[in-house]
Amino acid sequence: MFGAIAGGIASALAGGVMSKLFGGGQKAASGGIQGDVLATDNNTVGMGDAGIKSAIQGSNVPNSDEAAPSFLSGAMAKAGKGLLEGTLQAGTSAVSDKLLDLVGLGGKSAADKGKDTRDYLAAAFPELNAWERAGAGASSSAIVDAGFENQKELTKMQLDNQKEIAEMQNETQKEIAGIQSATSRQNTKDQVYAQNEMLAYQQKESTARVASIMENTNLSKQQQVSEIMRQMLTQAQTAGQYFTNDQIKEMTRKVSAEVDLVHQQTQNQRYGSSHIGATAKDISNVVTDAASGVVDIFHGIDKAVADTWNNFWKDGKADGIGSNLSRK
């Protein structure tokens, strides 16, 4: 109803404007054919104005008080009328919408209607709103939080992997160290065993040589002492042991005294013969006693020297090198 009222008001206003703009109120100048004259001296035809005009122009008889419009004025009038009518129509629509909005009956825009429809569907059918459930309507902060959580999980996985790798490497290093330690112990044991075997062999060989020297009656006492000392010093140098000149002189003196003692022992009742090499048994006993005799020369000298030579001369039968001044 209010729309019709507003439209009527706008139409009335438009009509008034049109009548003011295009012609109303002008009268045509009198002149030309007047009265009922059909022919005059000026060749004008006169008859009833209404009849002639009706015959020529048909039933649409123009007003005799109005001037006939020209072509230009008619075209301008039509164009202006169309423009004005369009403008007035738009203005009328705007005024109508405004009046309807004021009384609460105005229409809504397409965007507002779409929003209303969306809100209605979301409230009425929440299970159909898959787009919202998928998180499409979430804010960018939620997306950032999700990315941060993913990064945390990835970092945790990387740290866990590095920890596992480090533990595996540590276990591997332990196993390698254990294998190397066991191998080293075995090698050390084998080396010690080999060294002991070599030492025992060298000890027996030295003892045999000393016995051989002592059995050689063709050698004088001084020669026997010199040979024994040479054998002992060679044995020491092979083991990396060296003596000073004073130590060598002291050992030479001891060896000389021990050689005299060995000769005296070979003539006692134990062997029953003055000849050292008379029998194999006698020779074996002489070897043992000779070795013991040679070892005993270290009594009374420095303990470090005695300990060193003890490693070379003690074979289980002999007593080895004793320390200071103790003697059997």
Curated annotation (Swiss-Prot):
Gene3D superfamilies: 6.10.250.2700. One of its GO terms (biological process) is symbiont entry into host cell. Transmembrane segments: none annotated. Keywords: Capsid protein, Viral genome ejection through host cell envelope, Viral penetration into host cytoplasm, Virion, Virus entry into host cell. GO terms for cellular component: viral capsid. It is found in: Virion. InterPro entries: Microvir_H. The virion is composed of 60 copies each of the F, G, and J proteins, and 12 copies of the H protein. There are 12 spikes which are each composed of 5 G and one H proteins. Minor spike component of the viral shell. Involved in the ejection of the phage DNA in the host and is injected with the DNA in the periplasmic space of the host. Involved in the determination of the phage host-range. This is Minor spike protein. It comes from Enterobacteria phage S13 (Bacteriophage S13).
